[in-house]
Amino acid sequence: MENLFFDTFDGNKIFYRKWNFEKDKKTLIIIHRGHEHSERLNILTQDEKFLKYNIFAYDLRGHGYTKIKSSPNSMDYVRDLDSFVKHIKSEYQIKEEDIFIIANSIGGVILSAYVHDFAPNIAGIALLAPAFEIKLYIPFAKQLVTLLTKIKKDAKVMSYVKAKVLTHDIEEQNKYNSDKLINKEINAKLLIDLADMGKRLVEDSMAIELPTIIFSAEKDYVVKNSAQKKFFLNLSSKKRKFIELENFYHGIIFEKERQKVYKMLDDFIQDVFKNQNTTLDVSPREFSRKEYERTALKEYPLTEKIFYSIQKFSMRTFGFLSKGISLGLKYGFDSGISLDYIYKNQANGKLLIGKFIDRFYLNQIGWRGVRERKKNLLSLIEEKINSLDEKNVKILDVAGGTGNYLFDIKEKYPKIKILINEFKKSNIEVGEEVIKKNNWENISFIDYDCFDKETYKKINYTPNIVIISGVFELFENNKMLENTISGIAEILNKNGAVIYTGQPWHPQLKQIALVLNSHKGNGKSWLMRRRSEKELDSLFEKYNLKKEKMLIDNNGIFTVSLAEMR
């Protein structure tokens, strides 16, 4: 066993261990449960069944020898896992498809979010008593903890879990009780955030396609088995197993009869590695397509239809008081002009009540995500520009709206060339006015069909950065997307990159479709088909554009990815 550190996404260092390392062996990553640390995993890593694997594990933030404090955002733990996978791939020349990941309890939530949101091409996953929903024994416990976070920003709560409800093994109970590195505290906001993440993953596990095995402890006094079963039943994985372990407690790895779990786990891992499916699937995912069709046909209970009809009526009646709602009603809530207003995030309206309505509107979770998407988009664009010679940078945005974030780039990097394709005349007029006002050169608009493959030959332009932002989810048909992707792949400079956004999950899809109008005009609804990150990445991969980096907001709504030609 070696003790090491890696740099995570935010520049902090995280402690990790490696066992049994030899080149060309298959690799396991193990994520420990909350409150614990990676050294406790020795019990599994040194078992003879697992000596044939390279094994890596790290101490989560706020745990063990990792010095960083706990983060209140559960997505930071998912980003850490993404950073760790990238690190061991680079440091040890390990292929992504040769990695299998095992996670216990809270670690299972982190791992599930990683495969759902980042869609890595790993071999498979094992979830041991995943904590999608924690058992709360005090009435209104979640509400009380939420209130505590409002009163005290860095509030902590103590775990009620005792060693005697983790394992029947007395020796393991004693080890747990005497381990000074075990931390019984947990950040209160993180506890709430993990609960919300667990709920999201259970409801949307259809987006997960990897081989998955779940071990559920029959006598689990810490988490609810019902959530694990619902998660399993929704999975799209063709290879999956759910095993309920009779008389087992929550700490499955440390239980008395752990050897039978180790055997089943090893058998599953070997089978996965032996029968890996590397076929690229670019077909529309059935769950997403059906969700889109149900929304388009408005096939919802009458109570929901009435509820959203009231919202729509209220918005059309009183929306004029809010500047943001007024712009949405006039130009479409998904229009470039509407998004410009969202980005500014400055409440405006008629009278005090108008400003109040506008602030409520701007604070909606979807709009907060859109603003975060812009930040992430700018971050990846700047990262790519800085890897190139500024004066030789040529950017193409296939559907750039008014050019909002591109103007931020032009202001910071005046030497670059920017071409903005946009079909909406009102957006072009707004954008051209900004260009004229700033006396910018080498930035202009064109008006072509971004879904016509021939467009990209006609423009006679060889970009080294292509941007596709906020457009693909507006169209259901994957063939249209392939026309765009294949077209840009043909003209992209060999050292170039495509930066594209995704929307793997959105809590307001139904509300948006039934209440808000689109930029397409004639009162058409703002209807979207979200795509799982796996589906979206596969469409780019088909044309040899391989995702190298991805950023995501804390709520898991919008992704921004950078792909390069293989």
Task: Tell me what each language-model feature is.
Residues I208, I214-S216:
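Short beta-strand/loop motif that positions the catalytic acidic residue
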